[in-house]
């Protein structure tokens, strides 16, 4: 049986993550308050960020930037800005 959470990103009840995917207190906050769907949306944005900004996960500054973007996206409602990227219009 899956667990449900009130997803802070979606602002509604949704299926929660199966396990904590990120370490520490932030990981617990994500596990308790972010849905699978929202995490999937973040993973798409994260991939774009890493590729477009050529982030190196061995670099502590790059990891810190990515973590801040994750918090902004999941908890503060701020979209990820990637220069030159124009999202497709939805009808």
UniProtKB/Swiss-Prot annotation:
GO terms for molecular function: iron ion binding. InterPro entries: Fe_traffick_prot_YggX, Fe_traffick_prot_YggX_sf. Disulfide bonds: none annotated. One of its GO terms (biological process) is cellular response to oxidative stress. GO terms for cellular component: cytosol. Coiled coil: none annotated. Keywords: Iron. It comes from the Bacteria. Could be a mediator in iron transactions between iron acquisition and iron-requiring processes, such as synthesis and/or repair of Fe-S clusters in biosynthetic enzymes. Belongs to the Fe(2+)-trafficking protein family. This is Probable Fe(2+)-trafficking protein.
